[in-house]
Amino acid sequence: IAIVDCSDYPKPVCSLEYMPLCGSDSKTYSNKCDFCNAVVDSNGTLTLSHFGKC
């Protein structure tokens, strides 16, 4: 199981760095910050499916 530590999030601004992550919602997030902000918004229901594009 792939795990990302989102304890430092949410953050108001994300970098434009591209390191894609695939969420459990089958959406590709451009980087950890975008993904972790979405995890916080989902109240923890969103999880990481795998690293890379969906």
Curated annotation (Swiss-Prot):
It comes from the Eukaryota. The keyword Secreted applies. PROSITE patterns: KAZAL_1, KAZAL_2. The record marks L16, E17 as: Reactive bond 3. One of its GO terms (cellular component) is extracellular region. Residues 4-54 form the Kazal-like domain. InterPro entries: Bifunctional_prot_inhibitor, Kazal_dom, Kazal_dom_sf, Prot_inh_Kazal-m. GO terms for molecular function: serine-type endopeptidase inhibitor activity. Glycans are attached at N43. Disulfide bonds join C6-C36, C14-C33, C22-C54. It is found in: Secreted. Keywords: Disulfide bond, Glycoprotein, Protease inhibitor, Repeat, Secreted, Serine protease inhibitor. Avian ovomucoid consists of three homologous, tandem Kazal family inhibitory domains. This is Ovomucoid.
